[in-house]
Design a protein with these regions (language model features):
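Membrane-inserting effector segments that mediate pore formation, membrane fusion
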Residues: 142-217
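Terminal export/targeting leaders at protein ends
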Residues: 1-155
Length: 217
């Protein structure tokens, strides 16, 4: 397993070991806590030597991400190198039927993926759950709130950017991790963030576990 230079993954080299912990666990473990059969990170000597000081082998972590989206035989032909993160991201989007432009930036495609996950989750929520979510996210008039209305609210949040967009991203990532590896992010949020996470985690988990079976990672 070798790292292929990727400008979209270079930021990993600026992260601290504790910040990389959740990512490493997600890459190496299944929902039941067992080590993934297809991962190579934990078998690497550099990993064994420095774990859990993840920042000392961030390139191996990046390489593991790249290998998620690569065909095993093709990876061997490429000298053990996987594919760039954008290709991994687009492969996930294709299998989850996300509408995106392949010429868009990684950030834009990631945003489309997040909105797809949110949209599918909202469509699975009951009117009572939608109302509770609307209240938790600060919507003033929650009477007759629909999934379409909440999609519009979240789209506006992402377009506006800033801290609310960051919070919403954390909520989605937290729910995705819970669905994939059985645990969320190692962080403590404020009351509103925690409440919104609790409301969304179930529906997002249903979406992710239903669609992830089609994705070979």
């Amino acid at each position: 397993m070798a790292y292929r230079y990727d400008s979209d993954l270079e930021f990993l080299g600026q992260m601290k070991s504790e910040e990389l912990g959740d990512l490493v666990y997600c890459l190496t473990h299944d929902r039941d806590g067992s080590v993934r059969l297809t991962e190579e990170l934990t078998m690497n000597e550099l990993y064994k030597q420095h774990h859990p000081d993840h920042e000392k082998y961030w390139e191996l972590i990046a390489a593991e991400i790249q290998c998620f989206g690569a065909n095993t035989f093709a990876t061997i032909l490429r000298g053990g190198k996987g594919v760039e993160y954008k290709e991994v991201l687009m492969d996930v989007c294709d299998k989850m039927k996300v509408n995106y432009n392949k010429d868009s930036s990684v950030e834009k495609i990631e945003g489309n993926l997040l909105m797809k996950i949110l949209t599918d989750a909202l469509e699975k929520m009951s009117p009572e759950e939608l109302k509770e979510l609307a209240e938790a996210t600060g919507v003033k008039n929650t009477s007759g709130i629909t999934a379409e209305t909440m999609v519009g609210v979240f789209q506006a949040v992402f377009r506006a950017g800033g801290f609310k967009s960051y919070q919403l991203t954390l909520i989605v990532v937290n729910a995705v991790l819970k669905a994939l590896i059985g645990r969320g992010l190692s962080l403590a949020g404020n009351a509103a963030l925690t409440r919104t996470m609790a409301i969304l985690t179930g529906p997002i988990g249903w979406v992710i576990t239903g669609l992830w079976t089609a994705i070979d990672i």
